Each structure stands twice: as structure tokens, then as C-alpha cells.
Amino acid sequence: MAGTEISAITTKLLEAKKAKGITFADLEQLLGRDEVWIAAVIYRQASASVDEAEKLLHCLGLSDDLVPELTAPSVKGLGPVVPTDPLIYRFYEIMQVYGMPMKEVIHEKFGDGIMSAIDFTLDIEKEADPKGDRVKVTMNGKFLPYKKW
């Protein structure tokens, strides 16, 4: 990925995935975890349990010596502040354009607070459309009101 530092373990995992011809959707079926979460583990943006790490490595035909790295707390955030990858940049652009409007609508509906990125799921779906397939991204996070003291 241009402009993004990819760790050696991520490269190894992605190469094994490609060599096996396995998709993230395949891994979802094999591991019983969402494909986006599995991709986050591979990119070291999420941590797996020992059991999850062992299953992932087994599916990819890799040895268990990588388990400690996959189960360690991960350092969150990849790439430059302003992303350079075109697809990732679109999400940055969406937040630049719709971030404040989204914030205001959330505050109207829930009050003063934030959406959790910890108690959170993210789903990606493909929707067929005669004018061109559509990407459907659903973010679902727990609302966390600001505490008063």
C-alpha cells in the first residue's frame, strides 16, 4: 500500500492468504469472526485471542510462532494523517464533508457524547445496482455520553 507502513507479520500473513487463494469472507466462515475484524488483526489494528490466532495461522498454513505477535495489544492507526491511497482517502473526504453534519445529527438524537470505536462493528456489503455495484458500509458503535462531575 502506497504511503502505509506494513509490518513484516502483516506482509507474511497477506502473502500466505494470497498463496492459499483465501478471501476474508472465507476466513470469516472458517474462524467465526467478521471479515473486517479478521483483516484488522492481519493489519495489526486488532488483537486476537490465542485460540483465534492459532486458527488463523492454521488456515493460512503458518506456524504458531506468530501467535504472540497476533495476541499482543496492537498499535492503532496506519499511514499518514491525510491518506494517499484513493479508496482510503474517500473515507477521509467523507468525514471532511459529512463529519460535522453527522456529529450534529448524532447529538440531536442522543445528546452530548461520542460513538465508541471500541464497542463497535463495521460491516461491508456489496449491493447490486443496474447503474453499477454499490459499496454499503455500516458502522455500529455504542453511544457514550460525556460524564458530568
From Swiss-Prot:
The protein's Enzyme Commission number: 4.2.1.104
Active site: R90, E93, S116
Source superkingdom: Bacteria
InterPro entries the record matches: Cyanase, Cyanate_lyase_C, Cyanate_lyase_C_sf, Lambda_DNA-bd_dom_sf
Cited Pfam families: Cyanate_lyase
Broad class of enzyme this protein falls into: lyase
Swiss-Prot/TrEMBL keywords: Lyase
Role according to the record: Catalyzes the reaction of cyanate with bicarbonate to produce ammonia and carbon dioxide.
GO terms under biological process: cyanate metabolic process
SUPFAM superfamilies reported for this sequence: Cyanase C-terminal domain, lambda repressor-like DNA-binding domains
KW Lyase (keyword) present: yes
Recorded coiled-coil stretches: none
Reaction catalysed by this enzyme: cyanate + hydrogencarbonate + 3 H(+) = NH4(+) + 2 CO2
Keyword hit for Transcription: no
Source organism of this protein record: Synechocystis sp. (strain ATCC 27184 / PCC 6803 / Kazusa)
Molecular-function annotations in GO: cyanate hydratase activity; DNA binding
Protein name (database record): Cyanate hydratase
